[in-house]
Amino acid sequence: MAIEILVPDLPESVADATVATWHKKLGDTVKRDEVIVEIETDKVVLEVPALSDGVLAEVVQAEGETVVSKQLLGKISTAQEGDVSSATLKATNEPTPSDRQNAAIENSHNHNADQSPVIRRLLAEHDLQADQIQGSGVGGRLTREDIEREIAKRQAQQVKQEAATEQNTISTVAYSARSEKRVPMTRLRKRIAERLLEAKNSTAMLTTFNEVDMQPIMTLRKTYGEKFEKQHSVRLGFMSFYIKAVVEALKRYPEVNASIDGDDVVYHNYFDISIAVSTPRGLVTPVLRDCDKLSMAEIEKQIKALAEKGRDGKLTVEDLTGGNFTITNGGVFGSLMSTPIINPPQSAILGMHAIKERPIALNGQVVIRPMMYLALSYDHRLIDGRESVGFLVTIKELLEDPTRLLLEI
């Protein structure tokens, strides 16, 4: 008996998807609920599990193929493995990209079968074997950091070897030895490119700047951070302060929490904040909903959960849908200042940056304070200068006096 492997139902906003990775090759034994193939949309990666024990007998759609909801991907034979005739396994004589990838991971399959999809993909992409890397996770499981350390170690060794080789052969290296590599863009990267270009072409985007003294928040975190973490089991970060300040500013300036729909302006009376998160696949913006009703501990917990889902490739379409305003924190990468791009149909985005000690004038004295630049990009079709500057000044004042955030004044 053959069990069909079908593309799962795609959201209404997603027209099609791409076959990203086959984790099994023809003839491999599969177990019920084991992930056998991943489907990539322009937002998330969907895992397709086996519906029954059996053998992968047919692959209809190879990696890189475009598919739609309920389209046939392959078939699983539920007969005994020994009874499956090789004649029923439909494969071409010429190795496909899927065959080559499966061959690369076959030797390490038994060691990484219980790893997350993201870990398995990283192992395959960098030609690594799980049994050659010391895992630091629970039960010896590999983490992303383990793989990154291994990649960095190998790269360092490669650089050292290349330097030694170059020293001996530099005089004989020809100019023609330079090379290029062309790879197709992922669906997510193509979607990001489309959205960024759309934002630049369809909005009257402008950016206004300010700076904030972060000393009060840093003092508060130093004083209460340990107690906060002990009581709530989550670290007190900066983002909860940023979100609380943004929500209060949005209440005072509803134009920033609005969007343009044709000739109408839609004012939102709820506060769903998108948070820019860097993932192995690219930058995504999962949404924290009803932020005005969340405590700082709840905000920190939700941010942590969304960040972990992003790193593990577990974000759902629902996690990424909606949002009335976006916060992006380039400071985690060391950015001192930037002009963030609006995330349509939203009308504004707030950029936070690196906190740096700088000399400033305070009460007639030059003092050293931890300062951070703020950048608000906004759609000038809807938001005027008075509202944009007032919005940013409100955030500055709230962050410089965090007690007002807690008292909601």
Curated annotation (Swiss-Prot):
Domain Peripheral subunit-binding (PSBD) as annotated: residue spans: 114-151
GO cellular component, one term: cytosol
Domain Lipoyl-binding positions: 2-77
Pathway: Amino-acid degradation; L-lysine degradation via saccharopine pathway; glutaryl-CoA from L-lysine: step 6/6
Cofactor binding mode and count: Binds 1 lipoyl cofactor covalently.
Residue ranges crossing the lipid bilayer per the database entry: none
InterPro entries to which the protein is assigned, alphabetical: 2-oxoA_DH_lipoyl-BS, 2-oxoacid_dehydrogenase, 2-oxoacid_DH_actylTfrase, Biotin_lipoyl, CAT-like_dom_sf, E3-bd_dom_sf, PSBD, Single_hybrid_motif
Single Gene Ontology MF annotation: dihydrolipoyllysine-residue succinyltransferase activity
Residue positions where N6-lipoyllysine is found in the record: 43
Catalytic activity field: N(6)-[(R)-dihydrolipoyl]-L-lysyl-[protein] + succinyl-CoA = N(6)-[(R)-S(8)-succinyldihydrolipoyl]-L-lysyl-[protein] + CoA
Swiss-Prot/TrEMBL keywords: Acyltransferase, Lipoyl, Transferase, Tricarboxylic acid cycle
Enzyme class: transferase
One example of a Gene Ontology biological process annotation: tricarboxylic acid cycle
EC number of the protein: 2.3.1.61
Region of interest (Disordered), ranges: 83-114
Active site: 380, 384
Comp. bias intervals (Polar residues): 83-107
Necessary cofactors: (R)-lipoate
Subunit structure: Forms a 24-polypeptide structural core with octahedral symmetry. Part of the 2-oxoglutarate dehydrogenase (OGDH) complex composed of E1 (2-oxoglutarate dehydrogenase), E2 (dihydrolipoamide succinyltransferase) and E3 (dihydrolipoamide dehydrogenase); the complex contains multiple copies of the three enzymatic components (E1, E2 and E3).
Function as written in the Swiss-Prot or TrEMBL entry: E2 component of the 2-oxoglutarate dehydrogenase (OGDH) complex which catalyzes the second step in the conversion of 2-oxoglutarate to succinyl-CoA and CO(2).
Family note: Belongs to the 2-oxoacid dehydrogenase family.
Name under which the protein is recorded: Dihydrolipoyllysine-residue succinyltransferase component of 2-oxoglutarate dehydrogenase complex
Organism of derivation: Haemophilus influenzae (strain ATCC 51907 / DSM 11121 / KW20 / Rd)
Lineage of source species: Bacteria, Pseudomonadati, Pseudomonadota, Gammaproteobacteria, Pasteurellales
Encoding gene (name): sucB
